[in-house]
Regions:
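Non-ligating segments of multi-cofactor redox enzymes
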Residues: 1-171
Length: 171
């Protein structure tokens, strides 16, 4: 399991895309690949007003990542010390098996390099004691990042409540 946790306060996100843009910028990516994405939920009418929610979707850094399991060269790896799933670009041959294996679409094709890229929680920044780039530029401070055991209880409770409130029965 990833030891890190990225929480989004859905009530604060305005879909400004600064997190997505900063991710692409710091990874020097061309148009096309998006290691993180904002998914719009809605709009739906709440109190006779249209409302939408914007969900930030980076890689989930799965416990047993299918992308790692199918990679024939070992380019897609999971760091044992913290569970971060990342691509070793020197080993990637561009076969795209990881892209087909991931149900979330986290691995993305970079047409300029002919290799796969993905969210790695900015592991190089983490190793320097910094937060991921997406968190540092969030204009509404709706993104929180940390180790699961260090995440404040109120954030964990708010996450539980916000996700539970967004689950609705579909007729």
């Amino acid at each position: 399991m990833s030891q890190y946790y990225l929480y989004q306060d859905l009530s604060k996100c305005i879909a400004c895309y600064s997190c997505v843009i900063q991710c692409k910028s710091i990874k020097q990516l061309p148009v096309g690949p998006k290691p993180s994405e904002i998914v719009t939920i809605g709009p739906r009418m709440i109190d006779q007003r249209p409302r939408a929610a914007y969900v930030f979707m980076p890689c989930f850094h799965c416990d047993n990542p299918w992308c790692v399991a199918v990679c024939p060269t070992g380019a897609m790896q999971k760091r044992p010390e913290d569970g971060i799933v990342f691509v070793d670009a020197d080993r990637c041959v561009g076969c795209r098996l990881c892209m087909n294996a991931c149900p979330w679409g986290a691995p993305q094709w970079n047409p300029e390099t002919g290799k796969v890229v993905k969210c790695d929680f900015c592991k190089d920044r983490l190793d320097q004691g910094l937060k991921p780039a997406c968190v540092t530029v969030c204009t509404t401070q709706c993104l929180f990042f940390g180790r699961i055991d260090e995440m404040p209880e109120e954030i964990r409770e708010k996450f539980k409540e916000s996700i539970g409130a967004k689950v609705v029965e579909v007729p």
